[in-house]
Amino acid sequence: MVGIDALRSEAERLRSDIERHNHLYYVEAKPELSDYDFDLLLDRLVQLEREHPELVTPDSPTQRVGGTITKEFPSVEHREPMLSLANTYSIGEVEEFVGRLNRLLEAEGAQGRDTVAELKFDGVAVSLLYRDGLLIRGATRGDGRRGDDITVNLKTVPSIPLRLGEFDGPFSAGEGREVEVRGEVLMRKEDFEALNDTRPEEDRFANPRNATAGTLKLQDSREVARRSLWFVAYYVSGLHDEDTRHVDRLKLLETAGFSTGNQYRLCHGIEEIEAFMQFWDEGRRALPYETDGVVVKLNDVRQWRLLGATSKSPRWAIAYKYPASRATTLLRDIVFQVGRLGTITPVAELEPVHIAGSTVARSTLHNFDEMRRLGVMPGDRVVIEKSGEVIPKVISVLLEERPPGLSAKELPTHCPDCGTPLVQPEGEVSWYCPNEEGCGAQIRGRVLHFASRNAMDIENLGESLVEQLVAKGMVKDPGDLYFLREEELAGLERMGEKSARNLLQGLLKSREQSFARLLFGLGIRHVGRATARELAKACSSIEVLKEASFEELSEVPDIGPVIARSIRDWFLKPAIPSLIEKLRRAGLPLAAEEPGPLVNTNFEGLTVVFTGGLQRHDRSSAGELVVARGGIVVSTVSKKTGLVVAGKEAGSKLEKARKLGLRIITEDEFDALL
């Protein structure tokens, strides 16, 4: 029988080998093992640690796999502010910046004027905190002073070392020594495209940065691990020698196991900076990840401290952002889409063109007036522009390339979906289809909005299924969803008994959503998520909201006369009483959880923290109950906290609350206040 010491030695060897191959694959892009052989190593380590839990270490590669469900991300304070950089689109302003640095440093008698030019990665900024070489916390930038603790998700990113590389020098730590590393979390272009391919059209991410941001805030770390994120480091503090040059720090980061992107240059003058910018203006297209500019910063870290920072940005660095990417392509056709509120939107169908890291085949033309202003015709060569995260748009027509015989697209006078004559309300730019109850496109849009993630979050209900349900007359409004039968669903295309049951289960689960979510899901014009929350606070039920006068609605925070009129008009529509009755019969939340002030104001002005496990509420729903009664929910305990609700196995938050002498109540007492 193999002894525990031999197994411990094998586990240590496996951990070392796996981390080395991880680094070769994710950081150096020089893999030595096939995926199969790598998986064999990892599987063996997983087996050892499962059979002998005492062999598990905090920095084991098995801790990256994920599996933790996190219902909230507590707010944490950064060791030092994560400031944003001043930015410019002008090379001339970069020259002025360098000149200003030279003058300031000369006035201070500082020696050395070298700068470092490095690529500006278009990702999500995070901070990693290491204590005694071990990763103990990872946080988002947040507002620059406080961010969300997303350690559990960042641990799944293979290019983030769980333990700093072993070597003598600035990283060598005494007991309790903390080192902070900052950088960007990215999603490679090919991983972004693969992720979007798995998502329905209406739920696709606009760009890799949005996909990365959304991924990092997922509650299930297993899904984060599946999305192949990547980390690039650009800053480190907490070294023994804080006076190192920036280029030396980048090399230290590489030695410690981080990727720095390897795309930086020590520059001795503005000419070298401009050469770097010009090279990467074109060269960045070939990179596997998105970049949107170049950061120029002083190389001497002592000069960083000498020049300091404004309240928003450091004085020793600037970000040069490349001008918007442009491309020319053929405009194949112009189609007219109908939105859930009946808005008619012209959309340009384009010959697919690659621009700023993505392929563009469609672009909105916004409205008929914009179409006329551009003068676009099917068959034109057009200029497409994309700047940063902005959705690509048509900005001009190449009139000199217009073929003879083209003609303008005839503007519709009737709805493209149902044929109803279009109307243009006085004072508005857009045209609308007024056939709200009979237009299939509007019905589909309203049902999809009702089912969306931020509304009722109905699982297993996608666009293609909604299209079938509406086309067959099975669903005429969101209320009809709750009266669908398994046998009729199972007979639909690409369904079956299992899919039908899954949808019905999703509908059943959606009945647990809050009144505020339901109000948002109803799709009342101008009523967004925040407005729906304010309405749910002010009005205890759908009936109270219906009876509220124009003047009463106008007095609700964030609701002016335009929104008040929109709410009143919505209740006057002939189909609304029937919809409300269906939702009532289906058992949906047509009232706040407790009668409100219109609910009681026991939490009015209170800052509330939940800690420990609640038995009758989840954190999200409990928080909504507090907000509906005028309170504010936060995740950290401070002197400003007004109330702490302590559930089972409450930990450090409860202890801190006691030390601060804060008011602490049980879940039973919380329920009594509702």
Curated annotation (Swiss-Prot):
<feature type="domain" description="BRCT">
    <location>
        <begin position="598"/>
        <end position="674"/>
    </location>
</feature>
<comment type="function">
    <text>DNA ligase that catalyzes the formation of phosphodiester linkages between 5'-phosphoryl and 3'-hydroxyl groups in double-stranded DNA using NAD as a coenzyme and as the energy source for the reaction. It is essential for DNA replication and repair of damaged DNA.</text>
</comment>
<dbReference type="GO" id="GO:0003911">
    <property type="term" value="F:DNA ligase (NAD+) activity"/>
</dbReference>
<dbReference type="Pfam" id="PF12826">
    <property type="entry name" value="HHH_2"/>
</dbReference>
<keyword id="KW-0235">DNA replication</keyword>
<dbReference type="GO" id="GO:0005829">
    <property type="term" value="C:cytosol"/>
</dbReference>
<keyword id="KW-0227">DNA damage</keyword>
<dbReference type="Pfam" id="PF01653">
    <property type="entry name" value="DNA_ligase_aden"/>
</dbReference>
<feature type="binding site">
    <location>
        <position position="118"/>
    </location>
    <ligand>
        <name>NAD(+)</name>
    </ligand>
</feature>
<feature type="binding site">
    <location>
        <position position="415"/>
    </location>
    <ligand>
        <name>Zn(2+)</name>
    </ligand>
</feature>
<comment type="similarity">
    <text>Belongs to the NAD-dependent DNA ligase family. LigA subfamily.</text>
</comment>
<keyword id="KW-0460">Magnesium</keyword>
<dbReference type="InterPro" id="IPR013840">
    <property type="entry name" value="DNAligase_N"/>
</dbReference>
<dbReference type="InterPro" id="IPR041663">
    <property type="entry name" value="DisA/LigA_HHH"/>
</dbReference>
<keyword id="KW-0436">Ligase</keyword>
<dbReference type="GO" id="GO:0006281">
    <property type="term" value="P:DNA repair"/>
</dbReference>
<feature type="binding site">
    <location>
        <position position="297"/>
    </location>
    <ligand>
        <name>NAD(+)</name>
    </ligand>
</feature>
<dbReference type="InterPro" id="IPR012340">
    <property type="entry name" value="NA-bd_OB-fold"/>
</dbReference>
<dbReference type="InterPro" id="IPR004149">
    <property type="entry name" value="Znf_DNAligase_C4"/>
</dbReference>
<keyword id="KW-0862">Zinc</keyword>
<dbReference type="GO" id="GO:0006260">
    <property type="term" value="P:DNA replication"/>
</dbReference>
<dbReference type="GO" id="GO:0046872">
    <property type="term" value="F:metal ion binding"/>
</dbReference>
<feature type="binding site">
    <location>
        <begin position="84"/>
        <end position="85"/>
    </location>
    <ligand>
        <name>NAD(+)</name>
    </ligand>
</feature>
<protein>
    <recommendedName>
        <fullName>DNA ligase</fullName>
        <ecNumber>6.5.1.2</ecNumber>
    </recommendedName>
</protein>
<dbReference type="Pfam" id="PF03119">
    <property type="entry name" value="DNA_ligase_ZBD"/>
</dbReference>
<dbReference type="InterPro" id="IPR001357">
    <property type="entry name" value="BRCT_dom"/>
</dbReference>
<dbReference type="InterPro" id="IPR003583">
    <property type="entry name" value="Hlx-hairpin-Hlx_DNA-bd_motif"/>
</dbReference>
<feature type="binding site">
    <location>
        <position position="439"/>
    </location>
    <ligand>
        <name>Zn(2+)</name>
    </ligand>
</feature>
<feature type="binding site">
    <location>
        <position position="184"/>
    </location>
    <ligand>
        <name>NAD(+)</name>
    </ligand>
</feature>
<dbReference type="InterPro" id="IPR001679">
    <property type="entry name" value="DNA_ligase"/>
</dbReference>
<dbReference type="InterPro" id="IPR010994">
    <property type="entry name" value="RuvA_2-like"/>
</dbReference>
<dbReference type="InterPro" id="IPR013839">
    <property type="entry name" value="DNAligase_adenylation"/>
</dbReference>
<dbReference type="Pfam" id="PF03120">
    <property type="entry name" value="DNA_ligase_OB"/>
</dbReference>
<dbReference type="InterPro" id="IPR018239">
    <property type="entry name" value="DNA_ligase_AS"/>
</dbReference>
<keyword id="KW-0479">Metal-binding</keyword>
<keyword id="KW-0520">NAD</keyword>
<feature type="binding site">
    <location>
        <position position="141"/>
    </location>
    <ligand>
        <name>NAD(+)</name>
    </ligand>
</feature>
<dbReference type="InterPro" id="IPR036420">
    <property type="entry name" value="BRCT_dom_sf"/>
</dbReference>
<dbReference type="Pfam" id="PF00533">
    <property type="entry name" value="BRCT"/>
</dbReference>
<dbReference type="InterPro" id="IPR004150">
    <property type="entry name" value="NAD_DNA_ligase_OB"/>
</dbReference>
<feature type="binding site">
    <location>
        <position position="321"/>
    </location>
    <ligand>
        <name>NAD(+)</name>
    </ligand>
</feature>
<feature type="binding site">
    <location>
        <begin position="35"/>
        <end position="39"/>
    </location>
    <ligand>
        <name>NAD(+)</name>
    </ligand>
</feature>
